[in-house]
Swiss-Prot record:
Annotated organism of origin: Conus capitaneus
Entry remark concerning the domains of this protein: The cysteine framework is XX (C-CC-C-CC-C-C-C-C).
Family assignment from sequence similarity: Belongs to the conotoxin D superfamily.
Alphabetically ordered keywords of this record: Acetylcholine receptor inhibiting toxin, Disulfide bond, Gamma-carboxyglutamic acid, Hydroxylation, Ion channel impairing toxin, Neurotoxin, Postsynaptic neurotoxin, Secreted, Signal, Toxin
Record GO terms (molecular function): acetylcholine receptor inhibitor activity; ion channel regulator activity; toxin activity
Signal sequence, renumbered to the chain: 1-24
Residues with 4-carboxyglutamate modification: E50
Top-level taxonomy: Eukaryota, Metazoa, Spiralia, Lophotrochozoa, Mollusca
SS bond partners: C64-C73, C69-C81, C74-C91, C79-C93
Protein name per UniProt: Alpha-conotoxin-like Cp20.4
Tissue specificity of this protein: Expressed by the venom duct.
């Protein structure tokens, strides 16, 4: 098979891998919205751990959620995890 024909076959077949059989929706998602959902589905990454406040009078502490929020976080009661496109996972405070 000549190179041109082979390339055309590859270009026609390759996009099929991005769609599931059920409804033709893209498997890779929208790059932003479902990144955190996929991350949380892998193991116990949404388990809460104790949050340590590093500065008195500040809402920022350390580690509100296991293996996810890193070193910048806030108390467990006001903390939620966010996913920043191209920057990864982090935390934000609700207050």
């Amino acid at each position: 098979m000549p190179k041109l024909e082979m390339m055309l076959v590859v270009l026609l077949i390759f996009p099929l891998f991005y769609f599931d059989a059920a409804g033709g929706q893209a498997v890779q998602g929208d790059r932003r919205g479902d990144g955190l959902a996929r991350y949380l589905q892998r193991g116990d990454r949404n388990d809460e751990s104790e949050c340590i406040i590093s500065t008195p009078g500040s809402s920022w502490g350390r580690c509100c959620l296991t293996r996810m929020c890193g070193t910048m976080c806030c108390p467990r009661s006001g903390c939620y995890c966010v996913y920043h496109w191209r920057r990864g996972h982090g935390c934000a405070c609700s207050d």
